[in-house]
Amino acid sequence: MSRVKRGVTARARHKKVLNQAKGYYGARSRVYRVAKQAVIKAGQYAYRDRKVKKRTFRSLWIVRINAAARQHDISYSQLINGLNKADVELDRKALAELAVYNKDAFAAVVEKAKAALA
């Protein structure tokens, strides 16, 4: 069996990591050992923040819905309660879109919720 030197493989692996670390500051983009750590940490942050993004957007939608609902003299929790009682199955993302871009439709939804609460 012939001997296999690892030069080509190692260079390819190093190049892959250094390409992933492009744009990083200082040694993090130039030195393999440091770049590898930076890339691993970046991956951990990316994985975590894909989960956090969902929470962040949900809270943003709730803030927007609450602000729009209060303009119609109803709180967010009352609005959601009214929509549940009226069997309106609009999710928070859709409600927030209506609240921002289609105020007339949102007003109609609010009236439906108020009617269910009365």
UniProtKB/Swiss-Prot annotation:
Molecular function (GO) terms for this protein are: rRNA binding; structural constituent of ribosome
Q: Name one GO cellular component term.
A: ribonucleoprotein complex
| Superkingdom as given in the UniProt entry | Bacteria
InterPro entries according to UniProt: Ribosomal_bL20 (IPR005813), RIBOSOMAL_L20_CS (IPR049946), Ribosomal_protein_bL20_C (IPR035566)
> One biological process GO term for this chain?
translation
User: Keywords on this record?
Assistant: Ribonucleoprotein, Ribosomal protein, RNA-binding, rRNA-binding
- Record's CDD domains? Ribosomal_L20
User: Matching Pfam families, A to Z?
Assistant: Ribosomal_L20
HAMAP family according to UniProt:
Ribosomal_bL20
User: What family, per the record?
Assistant: Belongs to the bacterial ribosomal protein bL20 family.
Annotated function:
Binds directly to 23S ribosomal RNA and is necessary for the in vitro assembly process of the 50S ribosomal subunit. It is not involved in the protein synthesizing functions of that subunit.
This protein is called what? Large ribosomal subunit protein bL20
Name of the encoding gene = rplT
